[in-house]
């Protein structure tokens, strides 16, 4: 069924930005706002292709956790007379890491499920990078890599790189490709992809565009060979990236 349109819908937080009257650029229809009942203008083009028309799509998200933090800061000020600047909280606080190591994360956004708590107790996170990686890995597909990630962190399995220079971008994740940004950087390092080409690779992975991935492969292999890398190793790396595309996640979002 993938790729076939079954019905229409409205993204909960997707907003299209246009410098002119939007009807000069794309066809529009109307839909009812579920909260207010008001009529909204909705593009008839699907979100994945709307930017090809020259428009910008932004997702503006609300998060209840942020409201809870705001209320907590206000309560501390009211009851204790202490002013807390949430933007300067120490991300290396030992007491906080102990909570994560103990799986004491109930009420913590993205870290409160029983499964995540179990893996946190096994991982014993010691750096902010560990937490970012767990956030990215704890989803269907990449979850299979979590045991390896944990074993490599604690030295129970060796950290290996297909090509030694890949350590530059895979060191923080113990040799496992976790983020789209790592693939972007590695494509430039290994095969001299331009910034634009590496971003095209990221988009192709994020949106699972097999045709675009297939079109980029010969350039990667050719560029890698030119830089002195073994063709068979390059083929393996690309095959790993193709599997990675099924769950590719960007680091900025995980952070």
Protein language model regions, located:
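Mg2+-dependent phosphoryl-transfer active-site scaffold
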Residues: 1-248, 254
């Amino acid at each position: 069924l993938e790729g076939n349109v079954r019905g229409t819908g409205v993204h909960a937080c997707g907003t299209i930005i246009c410098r002119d009257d939007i009807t000069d650029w794309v066809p529009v229809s109307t839909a009812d706002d579920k909260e207010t009942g008001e009529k909204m203008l909705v593009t008839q083009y699907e979100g994945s292709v709307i930017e090809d028309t020259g428009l910008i799509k932004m997702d503006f998200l609300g998060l209840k956790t942020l409201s809870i933090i705001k209320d907590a800061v206000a309560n501390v000020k009211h009851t204790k007379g202490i002013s807390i600047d949430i933007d300067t909280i120490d991300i290396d606080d030992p007491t906080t890491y102990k909570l994560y190591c103990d799986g004491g994360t109930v009420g913590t956004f993205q870290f409160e499920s029983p499964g995540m708590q179990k893996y946190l107790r096994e991982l014993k996170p010691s750096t902010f990078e560990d937490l970012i990686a767990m956030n990215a890995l704890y989803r269907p597909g990449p979850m299979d890599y979590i045991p390896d990630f944990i074993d490599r962190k604690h030295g129970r399995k060796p950290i290996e790189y297909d090509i030694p220079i890949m350590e530059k971008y895979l060191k923080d994740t113990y040799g496992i490709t976790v983020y789209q940004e790592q693939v972007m950087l590695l494509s430039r390092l290994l095969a001299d992809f331009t910034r634009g080409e590496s971003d095209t690779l990221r988009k192709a992975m994020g949106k699972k565009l097999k045709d675009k991935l297939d079109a980029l492969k010969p350039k990667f292999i050719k560029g890698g060979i030119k830089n002195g890398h073994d063709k068979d190793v390059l083929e393996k790396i690309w095959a790993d990236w193709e599997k990675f595309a099924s769950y590719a996640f960007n680091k900025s979002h995980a952070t």
